[in-house]
Amino acid sequence: KIADQERMILGEIGRLTGVISQYEIDFRNSNKNIQIGKAKDLKLSNDKILNKFILANGFYSGIYNYLPGSGFIDFDNENLIILSSRGVLGYSNDFENQLNFKQIRNNIDKFINIKQFIKHRSFSLKDLLIHENKIYVSYSEEIKDDCWNTSIIMADMNYKSIDFKTLFSADECVHQFKNRDRVFHPHPAGGRIVGIDSDHVVLTTGPYRSRFLAQDEKSVNGKLIK
């Protein structure tokens, strides 16, 4: 009965999450530029000036909170790359004067899409890394129905279109409703990606609140994956 109540509550939350997520997906599919606006600069304690900008569109879905939208940044030479929690990907090399990011077409929705987003706002993309001319994205993968883990997709870096392929996907998963501790949350999922040399990256994986998995040497959860 508790599981049924949880499903009902999550369903109502999912409807709200779905509306926001679909709006962002529609923007991604439009391939429109991501507009930015100038915000008030911030003077730091060392007398340096921090220039602030606001993303005016494209980033709508939050991961921890519903709003504002969440995202990730990285650099590729002179280009600043941005990625939203729902797969809006763009770049700019002159954002002070250009005031927009050009979108990069991608197939992220092949791996995670509205079907997953409506189940909880924290089922999302988790990190972005540009490393050795490759682009890496981690995300919440629904391995089986309502059973999750954190995975990585990768591709050659390209500024027109990117065709991601799976780099890492675990065989095991943590069930959203049927798990040993009877507690689950998609936020403590890990997902951080770091390049450690020219041939390797490291991924963090979280326990999804099944904390005992971090102590289980046979489990990939709560670990660093190379």
Question: Which ranges hold each PLM region?
Answer:
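Extracytoplasmic, non-cytosolic globular domains
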Residues: 223-225
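A detector of repeated loop/turn-to-beta-strand junctions in beta-rich toroidal repeat architectures
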Residues: 149, 214, 218-221
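Intrinsic disorder/low-complexity segments enriched in polar/small residues
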Residues: 6-7, 25
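Acidic, Gly/Ser/Thr-rich repeat motifs that build Ca2+-stabilized beta-propeller blades
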Residues: 14, 18-212
